[in-house]
């Protein structure tokens, strides 16, 4: 019996013989841990058998060989060693098949981490990767959802977006050719967009016709599209696209379709920054610390797409600072236009004894003190 136990432990921890010896030693000394050791060994050995047999990790009873032959179709092309941030943070390989996208472990084309059929992909978004010394492309794949609020996509949702980064130049990509070659491509976005559009999957990317940020950034490849903006105290970037607005790239990644936006407004308007608010699906999404230099570009985009809502804008607008001198000038102007002073009903004197104190106090309060913006 003891020999069988030792074999079971050694098999489960074959890659670390010293650990196996320590577990065997403790197993003999402590009876209370013996049932737990059996369960752990059984679990590890079962996983090893599944990997050896090539069983698919996700739900389903098909083995990999059957899946490759009957579900994926033929290989169109592959892009290896890409940096994924969602739904997991790791380096993975991407294989584009006739029937969908297979994301696999590096160097293991048959070890599929997750599978994205074409009919479950809603759209693919490409934006430049901001604040990078080397130019890179960010890719966000939006999945279809049965939710009634599918026009508002967040990585907090059950079907969170798939997000990965690829080098911009073609020469830095590790490519695998299949049914299609890359002779007509100039960068990593060309490769993905080419086939996405071929099969009818919607694609989105920034354009100078839609929105350009006036503040140059590192890694923008000549034209800046991303606007620095905080969401729930997390720093990130807003991208104003043809059919929606993307915020990333901290979790949650957000994509709000223009068609779902009920109200749009500005708030917290200060000397250097302001806040942009979008109400969609009954929720207000506020993006803070937007630089005043991009106000005109944001306002032009909102106007172009009919997002302006005067009622909400007035409700959420920053209050006008009190200024007694303005009030006085208005009253003085009205007095100049009156011929007969007897017609004026003056209920209170224009000045009080402490007006000078009030004016000085308001002057001090009126000067905004802008603190330094903390970087996360």
Curated annotation (Swiss-Prot):
Give the protein's function. Has a role in meiosis.
Specify the domain of life of the species encoding this protein.
Eukaryota
Q: Which UniProt key words apply to this protein?
A: Meiosis
What protein name does the entry list? Meiotically up-regulated gene 183 protein
Return the GO cellular component terms, semicolon-separated.
chromatin; nucleus
- According to the entry, what is the taxonomic lineage of the organism? Eukaryota, Fungi, Dikarya, Ascomycota, Taphrinomycotina
Q: Which SMART domains match?
A: Rtt106
**Classification via Pfam families:** Rttp106-like_middle
Give the family this protein belongs to, as stated in its UniProt record: Belongs to the RTT106 family.
InterPro entries linked: PH-like_dom_sf, RTT106/SPT16-like_middle_dom, RTT106/SSRP1_HistChap/FACT
Q: Which GO terms describe its biological process?
A: DNA repair-dependent chromatin remodeling; meiotic cell cycle; transcription elongation-coupled chromatin remodeling
Name its species.
Schizosaccharomyces pombe (strain 972 / ATCC 24843) (Fission yeast)
- Any GO molecular function: H3-H4 histone complex chaperone activity
Regions of biased composition (Acidic residues) lie at: 353-376
Region: Disordered, residue numbers? 334-376
């Amino acid at each position: 019996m003891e020999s069988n136990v030792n074999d079971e432990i050694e098999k489960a921890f074959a890659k670390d013989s010293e650990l196996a010896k320590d577990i065997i030693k403790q197993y003999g000394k402590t009876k209370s841990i013996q049932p737990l050791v059996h369960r752990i060994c059984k679990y590890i050995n079962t996983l090893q058998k599944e990997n050896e047999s090539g069983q698919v990790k996700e739900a389903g009873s098909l083995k990999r060989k059957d899946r490759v032959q009957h579900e994926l179709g033929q290989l169109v092309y592959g892009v290896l060693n890409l940096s994924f941030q969602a739904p997991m943070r790791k380096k993975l390989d991407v294989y584009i098949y006739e029937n969908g996208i297979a994301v696999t472990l590096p160097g293991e084309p048959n070890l599929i981490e997750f599978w994205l059929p074409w009919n479950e992909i809603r759209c693919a978004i490409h934006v430049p990767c901001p604040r990078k010394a080397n130019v890179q492309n960010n890719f966000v794949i939006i999945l279809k959802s049965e939710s009634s609020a599918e026009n508002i996509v967040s990585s907090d949702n059950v079907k969170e977006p798939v997000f990965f980064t690829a080098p911009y130049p073609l020469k830095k990509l590790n490519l695998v050719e299949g049914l299609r070659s890359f002779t007509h491509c100039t960068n990593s976005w060309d490769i993905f967009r080419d086939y996405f559009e071929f099969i009818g999957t919607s694609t989105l990317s920034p354009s100078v016709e839609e929105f350009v940020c006036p503040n140059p950034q590192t890694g923008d490849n000549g034209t800046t599209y991303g606007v620095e903006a905080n969401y729930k105290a997390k720093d990130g970037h807003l991208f104003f696209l043809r059919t929606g607005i993307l915020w990333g790239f901290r979790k949650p990644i957000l994509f709000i379709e223009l068609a779902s936006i009920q109200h749009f407004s500005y708030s917290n308007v200060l000397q250097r920054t302001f806040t942009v608010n979008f109400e969609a699906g009954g929720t207000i999404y506020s993006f803070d610390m937007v630089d005043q230099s991009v106000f005109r570009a944001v306002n032009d985009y909102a106007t172009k797409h009919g997002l302006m809502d005067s009622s909400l804008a007035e409700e959420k607008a920053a209050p006008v600072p009190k200024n007694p001198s303005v009030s006085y000038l208005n009253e003085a102007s009205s007095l100049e236009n009156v011929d007969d002073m007897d017609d004026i009903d003056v209920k209170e004197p224009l000045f009080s004894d402490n007006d000078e104190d009030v004016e000085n106090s308001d002057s001090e309060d009126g000067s905004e003190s802008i603190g330094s913006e903390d970087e996360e």
